[in-house]
Amino acid sequence: MATWQQGINSGGFLAGIGAQNENAPKARDINATLGLIRENNDLARSGANNVALTGLRGLAGVADIYNQEQQQKALNAFNQVHANAWATGDPSGLFKFAQENPAFVAQAQQAFSGLNEQQRNDMGDLAMKANVALSQGPEAYSKFITDNKDRLNRVGANPDWMIQTGVQNPEQLSHMLTTMSLGALGPEKAFAVQDKMVGREIDRGRLAETIRSNKAGEGLQARGQNITMRGQDMSAATARRGQDLATQRANARTISGSEGNRVVQLADGRTVSVGGKLHGAGANAFYEGIDDNGNMVRVPASAIAAPPTSAASAQNYAMKKDIDAIANADASALDFMTGMTGGAGNPAIGADVRSRLTGKEQRQLYNSAQRIQGRMQNQGVAAARDMGASGINTIAEAKMYFQGMPQVDYSSPEAMQQSIREIQEYTNNYNQQYNVNVGNGGLKSPRQQPDTQQSAGGSYTSKSGIKFTVE
């Protein structure tokens, strides 16, 4: 615990307490205040009382009281309670001490008996409020001193000295302010002022949290509307692709004159003759057919390739470009959109604004991350349909499906790049499910060719619009 050594006999209040209290401020610490009091000639000529000087003179007899053994014990106990309150940030122990030691409080109040009620209220109110601001950190304390500069000057306190002491010896200054507020106001009023001030800070925090929550809700609602619109667009596109496939199947050539049998191309480039009846449903739906080697096979409906569209090709190229941009970026270039307020799918607060201020590269990285997140949400919509859902119509449904998808992690640059690599791996695995290897589905034909002759390279697009390449 920091200790104080009495320097000179300056100021009744601090001299009285400082001689016995190792935690009290040094008397010389208020020389600037007393100098300001002596220079306040206008107030002296007008006959107005200088509040701080009057209060300090009225405390001159406190030292004699503190010399008593019983009062010394109370003072030591007060020092310990204050040290605990400062260390924990919980002032409840001080209030309890004041209730259990009324004699100590009464002696502190005697020091202010020479002031009228208004003067005591002003000094005590300023002391307690300054103490609360001091506990909230240097920025809050400096703002309080600046905002109340005139009030402090009126009671003879030098704002510059207050700021300097608050920076150099905050715990010791808090000790002095606590003692002054107890003496000027009494414990009930002093801690009522504290609770009211802290309560306002809590209310401000709650208001800010409400505003953030409302903004988040509005953003989520807008995102949900966008998801619904994208889902409707995808439904229309899926319907068009279905019509195209139906037309292709209707025009497919038949084999051996068998009605209903047709030749289709698999995602791995081979052709298979399949029957017209679809067995099963959803992801397990399949056709029965015969490959070119005479093998009886079951062909998953999802393995039948559709011709790639220019839109799908462009999207997949853009996805790869965005993933490479973030994965290969320097970690320091991602600081602007990551941090404590960032999370899964949500960039750090203010990332959009910072990306506009920090340069072209940061803006491109921010847009790349947003596009990747949007495409992963689109894949969530596709996955929902694969599970049999007709679409995503509510925010709750969207959150449920998106939780199962990899998302961009904005908590730190390293976490962001790792999540991008996981998204790339997920996309690759998602595409691989369409590279169907029919395998040994039946008896081998003598016409069987080596595996190297069975596979054909090329690019194809799945029913969900995902492009993949067979090498």
Swiss-Prot record:
The keyword Hydrolase does not apply. Residues 436-471 are annotated as: Disordered. InterPro entries: Inj_translocase. Residues 446-464 have a biased composition (Polar residues). It is found in: Virion. One of its GO terms (biological process) is symbiont genome ejection through host cell envelope, short tail mechanism. Keywords: Late protein, Viral genome ejection through host cell envelope, Viral penetration into host cytoplasm, Virion, Virus entry into host cell. One of its GO terms (cellular component) is virion component. Interacts with the internal virion protein gp7; this interaction forms a tube-like structure that may allow DNA ejection through the host membranes. Inner capsid protein that plays a role in viral DNA ejection into the host cell. Ejected from the capsid after penetration the host outer membrane and has been released. Assembles into a structure that extends the extracellular trans-envelope channel formed by the internal virion protein gp7 and probably gp16. This channel allows the delivery of the viral genome into the cell cytoplasm. This is Internal virion protein gp20. It comes from Salmonella phage P22.
